């Protein structure tokens, strides 16, 4: 009996150690500040590896000169700048602003999309995007979707956020629709994820253009990086004051938890915030709220709402 107890103890130690060892690291990474930013270097990327139309894009409003406003667009997980286009461009035009649309690491690739990418790389991408925003405009408006919104909130206390006037958050991800997915970053989460979901995630695009500009098949373990970002975003909104915040969401969203979104919205510390419920979308998941590819009918009205929010600051 004593030997049996020892065996059970040994098994427990091994299993416990394995679970702890497989626990994803907390996302505490702080991107380094770029003291002497070079716009050309910040915009550089391996174009030959990218699907045309997914590359970073800088649009000058009136020649290569700084404008009062700068619009910085951050797309969602597995997507590209085409996700809600031309929403950011419409907002920039109405503000007389320069615009930068980023491409997150491992997105928009012709081959091996989302392979080996980390949340730390995405935070670097946000820091670089905001640095570009500072170079092209005095006050930055961030238009961010889903995981891009969570990444923006994850950077609230970073110095690159200092010139951000407004955060426009579309379907921000504070938790997946399936609450069980949050255990991905718990002890043993990655092991369970692989056992339950397999090595690869694949999904059917809504139309040909979504199939072209989104990554529709990727390693399941990449979802761990998404939840690491979500965990950090939830931490930051409770402890760090945000710029002005405007949120758009659909109560029928089947990708993110709207209950978690509404709870998080109440916690956001900001001098001005607004939340807008979008009832009709062209998205089967009700997650992509604007853009020519999925929800074209909402794009113009949403751009007008964003412009109105930006230009009419609370006293």
Annotated model-derived regions:
Residues 51-104:
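Short, surface-exposed "cap/lid" segments of acyl-processing enzymes
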Residues 103-108, 173:
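Short beta-to-alpha linker loops that shape the active-site pocket of alpha/beta-hydrolase fold enzymes
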Residues 1-40:
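N-terminal membrane-anchoring alpha-helices
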Residues 109-136:
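Catalytic nucleophile-loop/oxyanion-hole region of alpha/beta-hydrolase
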Residues 59-65, 213-283, 296-311:
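Serine-hydrolase catalytic core
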Residues 143-152:
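Gly/Ala-rich beta-loop-alpha elbow adjacent to hydrolase catalytic centers
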Residues 28-56, 172-238, 278-300:
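The alpha/beta-hydrolase serine catalytic core
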């Amino acid at each position: 009996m004593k030997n049996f107890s020892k065996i059970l103890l040994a098994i427990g130690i091994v299993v416990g150690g394995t679970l702890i060892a497989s626990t994803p690291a907390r996302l505490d990474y702080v991107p380094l500040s770029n003291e002497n930013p070079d716009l050309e270097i910040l915009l550089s990327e391996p174009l030959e590896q990218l699907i045309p139309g997914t590359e970073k894009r800088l649009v000058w409003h009136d020649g290569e000169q700084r404008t009062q406003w700068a619009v910085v667009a951050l797309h969602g997980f597995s997507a590209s700048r085409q996700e809600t286009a031309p929403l950011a461009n419409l907002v920039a035009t109405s503000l007389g602003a320069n615009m930068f649309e980023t491409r997150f690491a491992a997105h928009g690739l012709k081959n091996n999309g989302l392979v080996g990418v980390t949340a730390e790389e995405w935070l670097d991408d946000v820091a670089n995007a905001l640095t570009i925003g500072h170079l092209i405009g005095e006050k930055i408006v961030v238009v961010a979707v889903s995981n891009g919104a969570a990444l923006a909130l994850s950077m609230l206390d970073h110095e690159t956020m200092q010139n951000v006037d407004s955060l426009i958050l579309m379907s921000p991800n504070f938790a997946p629709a399936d609450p069980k997915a949050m255990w991905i970053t718990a002890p043993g989460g990655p092991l369970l994820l692989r056992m339950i979901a397999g090595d690869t995630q694949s999904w059917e695009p809504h139309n040909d253009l979504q199939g072209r500009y989104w990554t529709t098949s990727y390693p399941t373990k990449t979802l761990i990086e998404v939840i690491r970002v979500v965990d950090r975003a939830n931490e930051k909104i409770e402890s760090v004051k945000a710029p002005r915040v405007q949120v758009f969401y659909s109560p029928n969203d089947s990708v993110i938890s709207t209950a978690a979104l509404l709870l998080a919205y109440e916690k956001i510390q900001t001098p001005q915030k607004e939340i807008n419920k979008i009832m009709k979308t062209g998205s089967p998941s009700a997650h992509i709220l604007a853009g020519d590819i999925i929800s074209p009918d909402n794009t113009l009205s949403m751009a007008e709402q964003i412009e109105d929010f930006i230009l009419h600051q609370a006293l």
